[in-house]
């Protein structure tokens, strides 16, 4: 069964209740990659964060953005492009939906959320030039399995205090904590030139 809380408060309440009831659950964004990895146990609840998809802060001049983890990557890129910026990451090939009855935007929005991208530690071909998603993360908000919220990192690029939990959570598949928000380093879109 899938649960999709509409607010962070609902999310915390639900996770705390599941912790008290010893209900097993698995985190999910849009659910596009639930078939990756081991088969889901029918007794496990699926916790979708797709409604937690807001921009929390966009410091255009500082080239950073903080978003909730349920924001689709395509929506993030569209929002950044309006400011002449982009996040230099892409999904690896083979994860896109195969149906042809969708427009490119709809197909890409089904490719996944920023939280799913980080939880899976996925990177496409852009990592060869711009590094992977783990190198773009400068801060992260998380929710432990007991419902305790925590944050690591910050909202500035030059942040070196504390443990590097961002790298630890990147690629953990949600097994260590549920990613609720993330602060990312973005780059300006370079002007195209002929030649």
Regions found by a protein language model. Name each.
Residues 35-41:
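Short glycine-biased active-site loop of nucleotidyltransferases that positions the nucleotide triphosphate
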Residues 26-33:
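Glycine-rich beta-strand-to-loop/alpha-helix junction loops that act as flexible
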Residues 35, 76, 121-122, 180, ...:
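Generic hydrophobic alpha-helical membrane-span motif
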Residues 1-25, 49-106, 117, 121-155, ...:
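N-terminal glycine-rich flavin-associated loop
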Residues 45:
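Conserved nucleotidyltransferase catalytic core and NTase-mimicking acidic/glycine-rich helix/loop elements
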Residues 139, 143-158, 163, 168-195:
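Mobile "lid/hinge" segments at catalytic clefts and subdomain interfaces of large enzymes
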């Amino acid at each position: 069964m899938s649960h999709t809380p509409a607010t962070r408060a609902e999310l915390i309440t639900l996770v705390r209740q599941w912790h008290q009831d010893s209900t097993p659950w698995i985190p999910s964004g849009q659910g596009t990659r639930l078939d990756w990895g081991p088969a889901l146990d029918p007794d496990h609840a699926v916790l979708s964060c797709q409604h937690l998809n807001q921009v929390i802060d966009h410091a255009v001049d500082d080239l950073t953005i903080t978003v909730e983890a349920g924001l689709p990557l395509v929506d993030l890129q569209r929002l950044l492009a309006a400011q002449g910026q982009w996040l230099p990451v892409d999904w690896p090939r083979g994860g896109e939906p195969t149906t042809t009855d969708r427009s490119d935007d709809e197909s890409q929005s089904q490719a996944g959320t920023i939280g799913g991208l980080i939880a899976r530690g996925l990177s496409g071909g852009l990592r060869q030039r711009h590094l992977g998603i783990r190198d773009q993360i400068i801060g992260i908000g998380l929710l432990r399995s007991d419902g305790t919220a925590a944050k690591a990192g910050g909202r500035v690029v030059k942040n070196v205090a504390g443990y590097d939990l961002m790298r630890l959570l990147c690629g953990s598949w949600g097994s260590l904590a549920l990613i609720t928000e993330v602060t990312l380093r973005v780059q300006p879109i370079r002007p195209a030139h002929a030649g």
